[in-house]
Amino acid sequence: MVTFLAGGTGTPKLLAGADDVFSPAATTVVANTGDDIELGGHLVCPDLDTVLFLDGEVLDRETWWGIADDTAETHTELTRLADAAGLDGGPRYLPDDAQTAGRDIARWRRFSGVAEFMHIGDRDRAVHVTRTSLLDEGRSLTAVTRTLADAFGLERTLLPMSDDPVASIIHTPSGPMHFQEWWVGRNGEPPVEDVEFRGAERASATDAVLTALDDTVVIGPSNPVTSLGPMLAIDDIQRALHETTVVAVSPFIEDTVFSGPAADLMAGVGLEPSTAGVAEAYPFADSFVLDEEDSTPLDVPVVRTDTTLNDAADAERVNRAVETALSEVA
């Protein structure tokens, strides 16, 4: 049994070539929910959905977001209607009192659907509507995710990191903003001064997540701050990782990041934006998989390979390196 911690696109790209190395039936994926937002009244869970769509064989592999060949009639009409009415596209937060009203899972990250600032496809939207409706019927996010996973025919077990609200808030010179506003709405601007995982001090992992963390854990080459940071900010997840075997794949080659905002976010929270900084962020890691061009010295065993993840063959190669690293420390 093995458990992958997933956020962003790094770990999903690794999972795309994992089946011949780690049996899907014996694999659990715990996904970040700090990036989730409520948009136009519907809960959008980007990191859960990337794995849901990947394993459901409908993921758009060009963007690693949304459903391949999806239409966007509703999104287009929302934009047209806002333009016709002279409404600013935002991102538009709901009023402060609305941020902590209603369903708890969406606290501190509620946005208006006026000219929605995230591109939501029509089939993708159906998932968000179904998820939110099931939550409003009284089900937990874990239970709803299980229902959606069954609908998409997943063999791997997919779990949210918690059923409690945790929101990734980026602190900037322009004030605090949710990660999705900073990354999607503002293209990674302004500069990062700090990152807060609001609600993490009161959140707990579910029994299902803690059971999964009893198994060997793999952290893919995802962003250590906003993809993994919300999980690590939950005390019982942090404790569990210190008590199990963990192998991590660096998203850097020395100080060059493969993609995404990891470097800016790491610098913003006082971590060196490099493989060395990733190792500092993961003090519980028993071994690392690094790129063959990465000579960073670490205090734990290292397996090196080409860590490029452009296709399934690349992903299988990196998974084989993870398997080797696990064999050395298990």
Swiss-Prot record:
Enzyme class: transferase
This protein's UniProt keywords: Magnesium, Transferase
Pfam family, one: CofD
Pathway annotation: Cofactor biosynthesis; coenzyme F420 biosynthesis
Names of the cofactor(s): Mg(2+)
InterPro entries: CofD, CofD-like_dom_sf, FbiA/CofD
Source taxon at top rank: Archaea
Sites where the protein binds 7,8-didemethyl-8-hydroxy-5-deazariboflavin: D49
One of the record's GO molecular function terms: magnesium ion binding
EC number: 2.7.8.28
Reactions the enzyme catalyzes: (2S)-lactyl-2-diphospho-5'-guanosine + 7,8-didemethyl-8-hydroxy-5-deazariboflavin = oxidized coenzyme F420-0 + GMP + H(+)
GO biological process, one term: F420-0 metabolic process
Keyword Nucleotide-binding: no
Role, per record: Catalyzes the transfer of the 2-phospholactate moiety from (2S)-lactyl-2-diphospho-5'-guanosine to 7,8-didemethyl-8-hydroxy-5-deazariboflavin (FO) with the formation of oxidized coenzyme F420-0 and GMP.
Similarity comment: family membership: Belongs to the CofD family.
Description of how the protein assembles with itself and partners: Homodimer.
Protein name per Swiss-Prot or TrEMBL: 2-phospho-L-lactate transferase
Gene: cofD
